[in-house]
Regions:
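Single conserved hydrophobic/aromatic residue that forms the stacking wall/gate
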Residues: 1-11
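Small-residue (primarily alanine) positions within well-ordered alpha-helices
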Residues: 7, 16-17, 35, 134
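Conserved ATPase "switch" residues in P-loop NTPase domains
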Residues: 17-18, 124
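Loop/turn-to-beta-strand initiation segments
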Residues: 19-24
Length: 180
């Protein structure tokens, strides 16, 4: 029922946008890539090429958000993925290259865009969330883990990260390897 309502809303908003109206639409999606895939799923295969063309012309932004518990236990903090419609983004959307969108967002921070992983790293560096929260919410756990480990305030004088644990043999390893 909810999916049908979202489909109807998406089709209606697409028609409104073609006439120059500002349309805001909410979707249950985990990020930009998933939102675009979900929008595509609302349309029959024979309309997908036109959909990508319409989106490349009319779509201005996709904002995705997650609420995570704050490190200090005082409520939640928001992390936001933001995709803006640049010429290159329009080209990728027009071509239906949804798989390239996240990488393009990642490389477009100078335009104000950011991925969830970039937002998680920023929230961690600001002390808003713990490393574990950042890793649990990450799209690419490895990328976020690396950014956390390279963050100098996390490293002690011995060079170890807060994510390192001592093994029974007396070695220090990343907790991630032990969890596998």
């Amino acid at each position: 029922n909810d999916a049908r309502r979202q489909r109807q809303m998406c089709i209606r908003d697409s028609s409104y946008a073609e006439t120059g109206h500002l349309c805001l639409c909410t979707l249950h999606a985990g990020g930009t890539k998933q939102a675009l895939e979900r929008i595509q799923s609302f349309f029959p295969e024979e309309q997908v090429r036109r959909l990508w063309m319409d989106l490349s012309i009319n779509l201005r932004a996709i904002v995705a958000q997650q609420l995570l518990p704050r490190r200090d236990g005082d409520g939640r903090t928001v992390v936001v993925e933001l995709m803006l419609s640049t010429l290159l983004m329009q080209e990728h959307i027009r071509a239906g290259d949804v798989d390239k969108v996240t990488e393009l967002i990642k490389r477009s921070s100078k335009y104000g865009m950011q991925t969830f992983d970039q937002a998680l790293i920023a929230a961690f560096k600001q002390g808003l969330i713990t490393p574990e929260q950042a890793l649990r919410a990450a799209e690419s756990e490895n990328d976020v883990r690396l950014a956390i480990k390279l963050d100098s305030p996390l490293r002690g004088a011995d060079g170890r990260s807060s994510l390192d644990v001592e093994t029974p043999e007396g070695r220090f390893v990343d907790k991630w390897w032990l969890d596998r």
